[in-house]
Amino acid sequence: MNIEQFQSMLEEKGITLSSRQLEQFEIYFETLVEWNEKMNLTAITEKEEVYLKHFFDSITAAFYYDFSKPFSICDVGAGAGFPSIPLKICFPHLKVTIVDSLQKRINFLNHLAQKLELSDVAFCHDRAETFGKKEGVREAYDIVMARAVARLSVLSELCLPLVKVGGTFIAMKGAAAKEEIENGKYALEVLGGDLKEMSTFQLPFEESERNILLIEKKRKTPKKYPRKPGTPNKLPIEK
């Protein structure tokens, strides 16, 4: 996906990028590739691939959810900033918090935010399991997002405790999402979530399947969740 295709395919979806926003994506790409030489941020480094599989793929969430309001967003395990930083570039009014367990990725994000001149961003070096217990962030976010972090039964325990009641958990998935939903239904129920919508589409050019799940937080999450680091993965909430 070249820059012209990136721009026009977003425009088709009602997202018009200014020259400054296009410049920010260019700086993002350059910074990602530069830092990737010193540390492993991504296996995808070819420009057209980065624009398609990282930038465009992240922004597809906005095709199914309206980001026009100044929502507070927590992005769990964002790695090199996906999906929340591409969304922040497109919708500068969003208030973004990223939680990642690796300090070196947090260092990269702090550097990136300076280069992109982003405001209203915070980067927290923490495990989602401990972050979700903290006062002030637990059940505090309008939206919590994660892209390809873990299967839904595990991911729900990391993300739903952070969503305020009435807010939305957006899970961005590849193929086989239907099977994940089957296995994850019980966890959603236990943690106070309700699957509202699942949108399936193909990522352009490579035609790989993507699924975006919109999960509404209906009830408070029981205090015992999330459990201690590593437990959600070892013993997922499944029947």
Curated annotation (Swiss-Prot):
**EC class name:** transferase
- Pfam families cross-referenced by the UniProt entry: GidB
Q: Tell me the compartments it is located in.
A: Cytoplasm
Q: Which residues form a coiled coil?
A: none
- EC number, as in UniProt: 2.1.1.-
Could you confirm whether the keyword Transferase appears in this record? yes
Q: Where does S-adenosyl-L-methionine bind?
A: G77, F82, A128, E129, R147
A cellular component annotation (GO) from this entry: cytosol
Entry keyword annotation includes Cytoplasm: yes
Query: What keywords sit in the KW lines?
Result: Cytoplasm, Methyltransferase, rRNA processing, S-adenosyl-L-methionine, Transferase
Give one GO molecular function term: rRNA (guanine-N7-)-methyltransferase activity
Which family does the UniProt entry place this protein in?
Belongs to the methyltransferase superfamily. RNA methyltransferase RsmG family.
Q: What does this protein do?
A: Specifically methylates the N7 position of guanine in position 535 of 16S rRNA.
Name by which UniProt lists this protein = Ribosomal RNA small subunit methyltransferase G
Q: What is the lineage of its organism?
A: Bacteria, Bacillati, Bacillota, Bacilli, Bacillales
